[in-house]
Amino acid sequence: MRTVVYPGTFDPITNGHVDLIHRAARLFDRVVVAVAADTGKTPVFSTEERVELVRGSVAGDPNVEILPFEGLLVNFARTLGVSVIMRGLRAVSDFEYEFQLAGMNRRMAPDIETLFLTPAEQYAYISSSLVREIARLRGDVSTFVTPTVQAALRARFG
């Protein structure tokens, strides 16, 4: 079974993330969406809330599994027996960081490959941080996130 792990903070999950998950589900037998618990950031939503928001946003993809994880991603991937990590690249500005991260992961786990996917053009500019800021300022985020996430943001920010 060909499995890929797609890690992220997903605070919150956006339509860009959902696009990548659906596309990965067509390429792989199993997609594990790995929701990072220890991000070094202060998330708006708890790990459990983020897992549920991801679950609600990708319901209907039978080969997608959502799991929280802590610690190094390569260690988590190994515990799952996964040899491919998927990362999204929205713009050239993402590339340098993602390239460094992939290199570090390769150094720690030479048996695990990193695969980069770019989002569909209409999602290339969406980021979780921008969505949070728009929601915090009570703007309309309906074109950036699923209705499940929109409701959660409205409940959080008013």
Curated annotation (Swiss-Prot):
EC primary class: transferase
GO molecular function, one term: ATP binding
GO biological process terms on file: coenzyme A biosynthetic process
Site-annotated residues for Transition state stabilizer: 17
Cofactor(s) this protein cannot do without: Mg(2+)
Protein's job: Reversibly transfers an adenylyl group from ATP to 4'-phosphopantetheine, yielding dephospho-CoA (dPCoA) and pyrophosphate.
Name of the protein described by the UniProt record: Phosphopantetheine adenylyltransferase
Origin species: Allochromatium vinosum (strain ATCC 17899 / DSM 180 / NBRC 103801 / NCIMB 10441 / D) (Chromatium vinosum)
